A protein has these predicted regions:
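N-terminal amphipathic, basic-rich helices that act as targeting or association modules
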Residues: 6-82
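Glycine-/charge-enriched secondary-structure boundary and capping motifs
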Residues: 5-17, 21-23, 34-40, 178-180, ...
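Non-catalytic terminal/interface segments that mediate subunit docking, oligomerization
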Residues: 47, 51, 60-110, 114-120, ...
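Short, hydrophobic beta-strand segments that form beta-sheet elements in well-ordered domains
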Residues: 49-52, 165, 187, 678-681, ...
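Mobile "lid/hinge" segments at catalytic clefts and subdomain interfaces of large enzymes
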Residues: 76-340, 348-353, 357, 372, ...
Length: 729
């Protein structure tokens, strides 16, 4: 075969692996020759969208990444913030969207496993998981199948490994029918001095692979699944979905934490997307060193695996560490006690090259800089659409429906109904840190006392894809402020944010516009709040022949509060408490709302602008009042508007309320917009909020009464709110 023919064959192979012609030619230039099969496989993963962020990296540089509480920022396995008493909270959110759309149970389960490893890879013990989920309408059999599988997978992994699932969100919209979203967030706790980074260090030090054997599961996950659109052949991609074993991960977790306590590790990295290819390249790049890896030493689960398969396998429950040679015996002793496999598979070298050996034979030799830093970054070509690209939702409620019928319809809609049938599948109190559980408060609250700390932390995760589809900038501003509002409701000050940007194909102008405007909205709002991004994830190409998903930036925020016992609940807790409406003066509107969806209205091409500075000041006031101890109830007015928030507060503990609103119009009681809260407590605590709080009524009775609008018994409200349970029958 001629050299030209060989080049054509290799180029065809590169295309099949997701590389374009320009990228392949650039690889040849950086290598000084054509890559062989092993090298091409590694490059195809390291230069995939999932690993290289080639359509989003330039945008991400606009986000603020510095703050007074920040200990570890973007670029590490997870970010970390200080919470005082020498303690750190590490946290991150990541997506497992495409695998979950192909095989929902394993896709979601391994998504949880992966985010857990990210957290203990920096030396933190995982203490909580949250999830943000999106599916098509539940009238679809496929959506019910995906929901059931994903929720079961999350519960299986989290419950088995002993980490509580303390919060989350789930929404059902048509554009997620083919591309569900499964975003998992984890936070962990560590002493500040135990945090460890992933940079390989010390020429001559050993590279040790710990954990499960390596198999063929997950091969191509980063390129085949995570960096391309789904199509009708997605069932054929099931072999690229990883298989998880939470019990293996539990042993691995405890083993790694003990090794860190002993000071045995120089660096630690989990094996996630792209397996050994990514983990080793990133460790070498951050440490400015090289690595030699002998794939013949890697423990295998299957016979006759080729070197390239070993390098790109995404088998789960594996970690890579660097240790000094004299620490090997100690590591093997600890791993033996935890029944964790540990094999020295290579060493740190001087040259900044990743060499792959199969015994004595060198089967791959690549410059680390080319793998990690030289992937081309593409400029987006954004263009705002002249008309809405998403179809109007199906009408299920006539626009002539009165307030009584409208509230019941909203509460029974799958987007607003009680999530109890879902979160009851999760253990939310294991580890005995959880003080505020799902539907107990607007944010989860976990005490620090078991770890020797003072006070508590709060965490929330939020997204609002339909609102972002209406207006990518303002919708994202609302998502960030909503997350901060949830923390304010329990008296927590935000310390840091992690994000997951779920979008369609960035090569399409309208998706590029959505992505660019969304990042701009997030950056501007975070600077206004003074909150840094500690890390995150970008998931692109979430679309199919039906079109793109709603643009869905998901944000997770961690905050600190001085006393967990004082954290207000979202529901009314005592008869005779005064009820007040706290408002930042933001106009509540119906376009883009849950009510507009039920009415089958077209999505608007814009939302009212939000003054983030005004809302920030409101959040400061609410946070201060929540910490004072006099407010028993603080509930953010979000989806469905004020009437839904009042109904939720009534249903939490079966206490009614009688209120009189300054504006009883449908727009005012069902419209949406950030910056409003329902609060309840003793008169002095409510009045302490000053002019921001307008007393609107009292708690008591067995119904919700809104003067001039109507009344609803708690029985009929609860029956409507239980609609999601009926959907599972």
């Amino acid at each position: 075969m001629s050299a030209g023919a060989a080049s054509v064959d290799r180029l065809a192979e590169a295309r099949a692996l997701g590389l374009n012609d320009f990228e392949y030619e650039l690889i040849v230039e950086k290598m000084g020759r054509e890559p062989n099969g092993v090298e091409l496989a590694v490059f195809s993963l390291m230069w995939s969208e999932h690993c290289a962020y080639k359509h989003s990296k330039k945008l991400l540089g606009r986000l603020p990444t510095e703050g007074p509480h920040l200990l570890m920022g973007p670029g590490e396995n997870a970010g970390a913030v200080t919470v005082g008493s020498g303690l750190a909270i590490a946290f991150k959110v990541e997506s497992h969207n495409h695998p979950s759309a192909v095989e929902p149970f394993q896709g979601a389960a391994t998504g949880v496993g992966g985010i857990l490893r990210d957290v203990f890879a920096v030396g933190a013990r995982p203490i909580a998981v949250l999830d943000s989920l999106r599916f098509g309408e539940l009238s679809s059999g496929r959506s019910r199948y995906l929901l059931d599988g994903a929720v079961s997978g999350i519960g299986h992994y989290g419950n088995s490994i002993g980490v509580p699932t303390v919060g989350g969100e789930v929404y059902f919209e048509g554009p997620y029918e083919q591309n569900c979203l499964v975003n998992a967030m984890c936070l962990g706790i560590a002493r500040e001095d135990r945090l460890i980074r992933s940079a390989a260090a010390g020429v001559g030090n050993l590279l040790v692979l710990m954990g499960a054997r390596t198999g063929r599961d997950g091969i191509g996950g980063a390129s085949v699944l995570a960096s391309a659109e789904l199509d009708s052949e997605d069932a054929s991609k099931r072999p690229t979905v990883q298989i998880g074993d939470p019990f293996e991960e539990k042993r691995l977790l405890e083993c790694c934490l003990e090794l860190l306590d002993r000071g045995a590790l120089r660096s630690l990295q989990d094996l996630g997307a792209a397996g050994l290819s990514s983990s080793s390249s990133e460790m070498a790049s951050k440490g400015e060193v090289g690595l030699d890896i002998d794939v013949s030493r890697v423990p295998l689960r299957e016979d006759d695996m080729e070197p390239f398969e070993i390098m790109v396998s995404e088998s789960q429950e594996r970690m890579l560490c660097v240790i000094e040679p004299h620490k090997l015996a100690e590591l093997e002793e600890v791993c033996g006690r935890w029944e964790v496999r540990a094999t020295a598979i290579g060493e740190v070298t001087e040259g900044r090259r990743l060499r792959v050996l199969d015994g004595d034979e060198v089967v791959g030799d690549m410059p680390v800089d080319a793998l990690v830093d030289d992937c081309p970054l593409y400029d987006l070509e954004p263009a705002a659409p002249s008309e809405q690209i998403y179809p109007a939702p199906a009408r299920v409620l006539d626009s002539s429906a009165d307030a009584h019928e409208t509230l019941l319809a909203l509460l029974s809609s799958h987007n607003l109904a009680s999530r109890r049938p879902l979160f009851e599948q999760y253990d939310s109190i294991v580890q005995s840190r959880t003080v505020r559980r799902p539907e107990d408060a607007d944010a989860a609250v976990l005490q620090l006392a078991p770890d020797g700390g003072d006070g508590a932390i709060a965490v929330s995760i939020d997204g609002n894809g339909r609102r972002v589809a209406c207006d990518p900038y303002t919708g994202t501003v609302e998502a960030v402020l909503e997350c901060a509002a949830n923390l304010a409701c329990v008296g927590a000050e935000p310390l840091g944010l992690t994000n997951c940007l779920n979008f369609g194909n960035p090569e399409k102008p309208h998706v590029a516009w959505q992505l660019e405007r969304s990042v701009a909205g997030m950056a501007d709002t975070l600077r206004e709040l003074g909150v840094p991004v500690v890390g995150g994830n970008v998931s692109l190409y979430n679309e199919s022949g039906d079109g793109p998903i709603y643009p869905t930036p998901v944000v997770g925020m961690v905050g600190a509060l001085p006393d967990a016992a004082l954290a207000p609940r979202s529901g009314f807790v005592s008869d005779s408490h005064l009820v007040a409406l706290v408002s930042a003066g933001v106009e509540a509107t119906l376009p883009g709302s849950e009510l507009a969806k039920l009415r089958g209205d077209e999505l608007p091409l814009g939302l009212p602008a939000v003054n983030a500075a005004v809302v920030r000041d409101m959040l400061d006031a609410v946070r201060s009042a929540a910490r004072g101890g006099g407010l028993a109830t603080v509930h953010d007015v979000a989806e469905g508007g004020l009437a839904v928030a009042l109904a939720e507060s009534c249903l939490a503990r079966g206490l009614g309320a009688s209120v009189s609103l300054p504006d009883p119009s449908l727009d005012a009681i069902f419209g949406e917009g950030v910056g409003r809260f329902v609060v309840a407590g003793e008169r002095a605590a409510v009045e302490a909020l000053g002019e921001r709080a307008a007393v609107i009524g009292t708690v008591g009775g067995d119904s919700l009464e809104i003067e001039g609008v109507g009344g609803w018994t708690l029985l009929e409200l609860r029956e409507a709110w239980s609609a999601l349970a009926e959907a599972f029958v």
